[in-house]
Amino acid sequence: ASYPIRVFLMKDIVTIGIDTSGVSLHKRGYREVAGKAPITETLAAALIMLTPWNKDRILVDPFCGSGTFPIEAAMMAANIAPGMNRSFTAEAWTNIIPKKLWYDIINEANDMIHDDIEVDIQGYDVDPSVIKIARRNAREAGVDHLIHFQKRDVRELNHPKKYGFVITNPPYKGIEIAKVENTVTDEDV
């Protein structure tokens, strides 16, 4: 097994550590393909956690792209551990960490999953090719049955229920903000 060493320098301080993770932790293992400007999985999860959203409330991403916000929300709702679909460098260190311990941790995390829940998580985008990518990513994450993805323009954003959350990573260009602002009224908020 290899033991990658990481050295960090900041001014006159040196920190030396062993990399137990391998690939960066923001790579959850479900997103093989992404859209043009994807938000990292960890940032999406953190932004969702900053809201009072919970699985009993509606969550809509009107510019869902490759589906990161809806997928992270569905994983939270189903209590799926963020690292379930990836491997870690330390898994190969069986001389330090017994293989059985990894199996026990994975089994415990699997036992905590609640995928038979009902949630209202929706992802929309005008580009049908990214909706296809979002569906594939949700399937890889094991939450495709919890999310409704649809080709839809943000100007058609509406929902029969009164309260919920809109969380999104809007496109950086090619959309007129004034049109989006006119779509959402004070009554909608």
Model-derived regions: residue spans:
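Non-catalytic substrate-recognition/targeting regions of SAM-dependent transferases
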Residues: 1-30
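Non-cysteine beta-strand/loop elements that form the S-adenosyl-L-methionine
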Residues: 17, 167-168
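Short acidic, glycine/proline-rich loop/turn micro-motifs
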Residues: 27-31, 177-180
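Class I SAM-dependent methyltransferase Rossmann-like catalytic core
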Residues: 29-39
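Conserved S-adenosyl-L-methionine
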Residues: 39, 43-158
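A short acidic, Gly/Pro-enriched loop at the edge of an enzyme's catalytic core
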Residues: 155-167
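Glycine-rich S-adenosyl-L-methionine
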Residues: 180-189
